[in-house]
Amino acid sequence: MSNHKLIEAVTKSQLRTDLPTFRSGDTLRVHVRIVEGSRERIQVFEGVVIKRRGGGISETFTVRKISSGVGVERTFPLHTPKIEKIEVKRRGKVRRAKLYYLRSLRGKAARIQEIR
């Protein structure tokens, strides 16, 4: 078996199929498993997807939310076992793949139109 086929076989077994389809502009609730010492808990991070990048096992997505008036962005690997589940709350209507312009917008200007 060639190296390429071997790598492809290993990564295919690691890919997750239980996650919903989503794209930039969608509002997600990401349930992340957090380990603190011997305890484990689930933390929910809700925000707008501003980008998806990569493909295969190394695919990542970035979620942005406003917390206490401060913008917080968190990048997650898509196929990590640390993600318990992803819920799509709203489907956003955007015409860009990368929504970096949201970083400079404040308040109602930063809203994204919902797909009906």
UniProtKB/Swiss-Prot annotation:
GO CC term, one of those recorded: cytosolic large ribosomal subunit
Source taxon at top rank: Bacteria
Name of protein: Large ribosomal subunit protein bL19
Pfam families: Ribosomal_L19
Organism: Staphylococcus epidermidis (strain ATCC 35984 / DSM 28319 / BCRC 17069 / CCUG 31568 / BM 3577 / RP62A)
Entries under InterPro entries matching the protein: Ribosomal_bL19 (IPR001857), Ribosomal_bL19_CS (IPR018257), Ribosomal_bL19_sf (IPR038657), Translation_prot_SH3-like_sf (IPR008991)
UniProt keyword list: Ribonucleoprotein, Ribosomal protein
Record GO terms (molecular function): structural constituent of ribosome
NCBIfam families noted in UniProt: rplS_bact
UniProt keyword Repressor, yes or no: no
Family: Belongs to the bacterial ribosomal protein bL19 family.
Function, in words: This protein is located at the 30S-50S ribosomal subunit interface and may play a role in the structure and function of the aminoacyl-tRNA binding site.
GO biological process: translation
